[in-house]
From Swiss-Prot:
GO BP, sorted A to Z: G protein-coupled receptor signaling pathway
Positions where lipid (S-farnesyl cysteine) attaches: 66
InterPro entries to which the protein is assigned, alphabetical: G-protein_gamma-like_dom, GGL_sf, Gprotein-gamma
CDD domains: GGL
Protein name: Guanine nucleotide-binding protein G(I)/G(S)/G(O) subunit gamma-T2
Record-level Gene Ontology MF annotations: G-protein beta-subunit binding
Domain of life, per lineage: Eukaryota
Region (Disordered): 47-69
Membrane topology annotation: Lipid-anchor
Any Pfam family hit: G-gamma
Keyword Transport among UniProt keywords: no
Amino acid sequence: MAQELSEKELLKMEVEQLKKEVKNPRALISKTGKEIKDYVEAEAGNDPLLKGIPEDKNPFKEKGGCMIS
């Protein structure tokens, strides 16, 4: 699709995207980094990658063997 558009059209699209992005609120990383760290530490107990999945609730556990007769 990008090959079908002229350079002028591509630049217009880029300007429109930048106009949308400039409206996004910005925050200092010193503040947001701490908030993210606190959130991750608070939710670590609920993370199945950290604490594992109980065998009875594991959807990927093999249900049974394969029988060939």
